[in-house]
Amino acid sequence: MTDIFARRATLARSVRLLSQFRYERSEPARFYGALAADTAAMVDDLWRAGHGESAAGRTLLDVGGGPGYFAAAFADAGVRYLGVEPDPGEMHAAGPVVAADTGTFVRASGMALPFADDSVDICLSSNVAEHVPRPWQLGAEMLRVTRPGGLAVLSYTVWLGPFGGHEMGLTHYLGGSRAAARYARKHGHPAKNNYGSSLFEVSVADGLAWAACTGAELAAFPRYHPRWAWWLTSVPVLREFLVSNLVLVLQPQ
């Protein structure tokens, strides 16, 4: 399932993606545009590996799609895009940067998707599971709406990884509550990704255990790592600190 994508998972790609993180706040279009393009290519690689053809023409549901950067990337790839986002502020954050006709957007929760069973070819969630209190309920909803033989791709930021604290930086290693309080004292307001309300601890071990119990797991790998470092996913404890983002690929039967 990962053979095609693995050829693209090079050190150069990892460096290129990680170099964009510094623009997340100052130039969001640059950061999210690069991440969206890479994600669309990754999803197409995974689809090709399982189906022998491009994902163009397929219907994709993006759970937590945000303001539309991902919609634009998938539209460029010829994929029919449906985006779900619970926060109206996020839905309009890109303003006129992203064309309105790149997809269809629905305001709803990823933990209660307003779509019928087996209704989409691909269901994607990118960096959302760590922002909901019940990430595996979100995962179950993704599997529910994905057609048998389709793909559910769930990617999330690992709590103990270097990016787990989001804008709180590495202070999350002091504990989530302490890091959140420290951020609020320093900046005079809570973090956007506030521990306990909009940011939660999600581990590699929990994700792997959930995927295994679904009976639908096809692959699990670190999203931003080169192929030669994917072995980290299989090492308990170490993976929690060095796998910054885990991708779970599942196929309902």
Swiss-Prot record:
UniProt xrefs under Pfam families: Methyltransf_11
GO aspect biological process, one term: methylation
SUPFAM superfamilies listed in its UniProt record: S-adenosyl-L-methionine-dependent methyltransferases
Enzyme class: transferase
GO molecular function, one term: S-adenosylmethionine-dependent methyltransferase activity
Keywords: Methyltransferase, Transferase
CDD domains per record: AdoMet_MTases
Record-linked InterPro entries: Methyltransf_11, SAM-dependent_MTases_sf
EC number: 2.1.1.-
Family: Belongs to the methyltransferase superfamily.
This protein's name: Uncharacterized methyltransferase MAV_4945
Annotated source species: Mycobacterium avium (strain 104)
